[in-house]
């Protein structure tokens, strides 16, 4: 296992520790996208984020990976600060890693990634709120039509 894969595996473990409800899904060695979509999505998202942290920090690739991870975390029962904080443990993992990483550069990029994660989480929660509001309005209209038809 190379240093990058080792870091991603440790990061996955930290995410699993932070949210026990997802732990089994994340700890599956080779998650199947059909049998274990949560584990598969989060594992792939973290691997993509790690690639971007080491690479050119492509905003579209980062947004896509964060979107996949945070859509899951936005519907789980956890506070927003916890849902978006999965980026932070990467600092400790890197400080203990046996690899040649530019820690100052990665530290700055982790900060940017954490900010982007919070923004994406808020966007996902806003979408959930809008969907709930739309569904409530639809049910109210349906209820009025049923009452009107029965009257």
Language model region names:
Residues 71, 86-87, 110:
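Generic preference for hydrophobic/aromatic residues in regular secondary structure cores
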Residues 1-68, 99-151:
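Core of compact, soluble alpha-helical bundle domains
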Residues 78-97:
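Elongated alpha-helical scaffolds
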């Amino acid at each position: 296992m190379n240093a990058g894969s080792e870091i991603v595996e440790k990061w996955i473990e930290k995410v699993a520790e932070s949210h026990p409800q997802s732990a089994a899904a994340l700890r599956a060695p080779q998650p199947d996208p059909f049998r274990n979509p949560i584990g598969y999505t989060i594992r792939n998202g973290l691997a993509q984020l790690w690639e971007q942290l080491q690479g050119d920090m492509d905003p579209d690739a980062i947004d896509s990976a964060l979107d996949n991870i945070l859509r899951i975390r936005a519907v789980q029962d956890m506070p927003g600060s916890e849902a978006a904080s999965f980026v932070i443990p990467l600092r400790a993992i890197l400080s203990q890693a046996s690899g040649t990483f530019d820690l100052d550069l990665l530290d700055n990029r982790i900060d940017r990634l954490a900010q982007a994660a919070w923004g994406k989480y808020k966007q996902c929660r806003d979408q959930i709120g809008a969907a709930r509001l739309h569904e409530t309005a639809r049910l109210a209209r349906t209820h009025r039509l049923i009452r009107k038809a029965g009257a």
